[in-house]
């Protein structure tokens, strides 16, 4: 017997076993990859049409804006939302409706309501601090930054020649008395949103701010209003916190605290509304959703 040959064959056994193990490992790896592929999570579609569905609230507000931007266009339009309280004219208390979430009121119901856009000084201060923190956070890398401005101005209101309800407003810079604007502001339409889960309701207003000539030098203002305003701008949506002091005898106090959110680029909004009229609604819906999301963040923050 050739021992050398036997020893040679015996020494080959480990390498043969190693090859078998390696081959088994490769097969096992193939099976695992197949199994991973077979149990992959399927893609989730938005719905059975795989199309985005616009919330009713966004659609109603978009239609409301489109009417005054395109159908019956207001030339010098201002569109803003204010936080406040819907008051029942019969009870003089906040309205109570049998609904559980944010609800748009039919404009025909507006005659039964009054909207008070005032809030307490502590609520105003809290929202100021909240927005200041949001401003700081937006300056971090990867964010779209806020713009910020603090202004103080005086508004002088003058009666018109026809003594109409719409007055001429002259706005001046408090520091140097420079005239910033002279307009006749006319309220065109309101849309009220009742928000039972939060401290504030919402009023969306359409106004016409028509530039006019300065009142004559001997005409005295019927009302003077001082404005201390902190303004923030993010993605062309303006957020203003304003403290006003006025001599209007209608209110019990001369000091009021308000928060408003306003579309900063009306030309762009009008273009989006025209596209919506022509059948391409998505750009307008996205802008309205952005606007309302900003309003909702502020409305819910102190509730």
Curated annotation (Swiss-Prot):
* Gene3D superfamilies for this protein: mRNA triphosphatase Cet1-like
Which Enzyme Commission number(s) are on file for it?
A: 3.6.1.74
Record's subcellular location: Nucleus
Q: Is this entry keyworded Nucleus?
A: yes
Pfam families, per database record: mRNA_triPase
Example GO CC term: the record gives: nucleus
From the UniProt record, list the reaction(s) this protein catalyses. a 5'-end triphospho-ribonucleoside in mRNA + H2O = a 5'-end diphospho-ribonucleoside in mRNA + phosphate + H(+)
Q: Main localisation, per the record?
A: nucleus
Q: Does the keyword Hydrolase apply?
A: yes
Which cysteines pair up through disulfides? They are none
Q: Which GO terms describe its biological process?
A: 7-methylguanosine mRNA capping
Q: Which GO terms describe its molecular function?
A: ATP hydrolysis activity; mRNA 5'-triphosphate monophosphatase activity; polynucleotide 5'-phosphatase activity; RNA polymerase II C-terminal domain binding
Function as written in the Swiss-Prot or TrEMBL entry = First step of mRNA capping. Converts the 5'-triphosphate end of a nascent mRNA chain into a diphosphate end.
Q: How does it assemble?
A: Heterodimer. The mRNA-capping enzyme is composed of two separate chains alpha and beta, respectively a mRNA guanylyltransferase and an mRNA 5'-triphosphate monophosphatase.
Q: What name appears for this protein in its UniProt entry?
A: mRNA-capping enzyme subunit beta
Lineage of the native species?
Answer: Eukaryota, Fungi, Dikarya, Ascomycota, Taphrinomycotina
């Amino acid at each position: 017997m050739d021992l050398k040959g036997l020893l040679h064959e015996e020494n080959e056994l480990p390498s043969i076993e190693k090859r078998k193990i390696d081959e088994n490992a490769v097969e096992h790896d193939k099976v695992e990859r197949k199994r991973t592929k077979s149990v992959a999570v399927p893609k989730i579609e938005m719905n059975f049409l795989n199309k985005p569905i616009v919330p009713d609230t966004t659609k109603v507000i978009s239609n409301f804006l489109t009417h005054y931007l395109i159908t019956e266009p207001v030339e010098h339009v201002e569109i803003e939302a204010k936080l406040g309280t819907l008051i029942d004219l019969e009870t003089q208390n906040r309205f109570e409706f049998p609904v559980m979430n944010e609800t748009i009121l039919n404009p025909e119901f507006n005659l039964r309501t009054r909207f008070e856009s005032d809030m307490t000084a502590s609520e105003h201060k809290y929202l100021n601090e909240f927005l200041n923190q949001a401003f700081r956070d937006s300056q971090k890398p990867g964010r779209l930054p806020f713009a910020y401005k603090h202004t103080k101005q005086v508004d002088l209101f003058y009666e018109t020649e026809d003594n109409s309800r719409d007055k001429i407003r002259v706005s001046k810079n408090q520091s140097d008395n420079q005239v910033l604007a002279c307009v006749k502001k006319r309220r065109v339409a309101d849309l009220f949103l009742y928000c039972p889960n939060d401290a504030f309701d919402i009023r969306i207003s359409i106004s016409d701010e028509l530039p006019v000539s300065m009142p004559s030098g001997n005409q005295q203002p019927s009302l003077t209003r001082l404005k201390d305003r902190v303004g923030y701008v993010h993605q062309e949506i303006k957020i203003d916190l304003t403290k006003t002091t006025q001599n209007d005898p209608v209110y019990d106090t001369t000091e009021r605290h308000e928060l408003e959110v306003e579309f900063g680029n009306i030309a762009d909004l009008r273009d989006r509304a025209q596209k919506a009229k022509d059948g391409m609604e998505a750009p307008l819906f996205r802008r309205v959703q952005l606007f309302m999301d900003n309003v909702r963040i502020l409305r819910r923050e102190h509730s």
